[in-house]
Amino acid sequence: MVKTALLHNKVLAFPTETFYGLGGNAFFKEVADRVYNIKERPRNKPLLVLTTPEWLPGLCLWNDSRIDDLMNAFWPGPLTLILAANPELPQHLQNSDGTLAVRYTSAPAAQCLIELGSCPIIGTSANLTGMPECSTATEVHNQLNNKVDVIIDGGELEENRASTILNCQNNLFEVLRHGVITSAEINLICEVS
C-alpha cells in the first residue's frame, strides 16, 4: 500500500526525527501541489526534500568542504541544508533563487519511504500553516481532516523541536531556523551567523 502510494502521486504523513512529516515522491509535481494545498502553505515558501546520500548529487551542487564536514557531523539527523539545486531538477523542487532545502533523515520510517519509492521525498511538517506541528498520527488526522492519503503511525514523537535550517549559499553560513542542532554545535564544525 505505501509503495503504491509513492508511485501514484499520493500524499503520506510519516514520523521523522522531529515531528510528523507530510510528503511523497518529490519528483511528482502533483504531490508538491497537493502538499501546498493540504497545508494551505504559500507557494513562495519552498518545500524540504528528505534524501539519502545516493540521491544527493543529483539534487544539489556544492564545492565547499564545510558542507561535507557538516554532513559528516550531523547526518543522518535533524540538520536541513539549503544548497544550490541541480539546474536539471524539475522547477517545482527549486526555490526561486535556484536552491533546495535537503536533509538526510535519521528516521527509519522516512528512510524506508525513500527506499520503497526509489526516490527522495518531500518532507515538510504535517500541519496546517501557522498551526502547531504534530507529534502523533492522531494529531495529523485531526488537524489535516482526512486530506492525507496514508498516515504511518509511528507513535508519539519525543523530540518536539524542528530541524535546524542552515543556509549554505554565502561565505558565512546562516542559521535560518534554530532547532535540534544548536548554533554552538554547528560552530564546532564551521562558523555560522
Annotate each language-model stretch with its function.
Residues 1-193:
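Active-site-adjacent structural elements in enzyme catalytic cores
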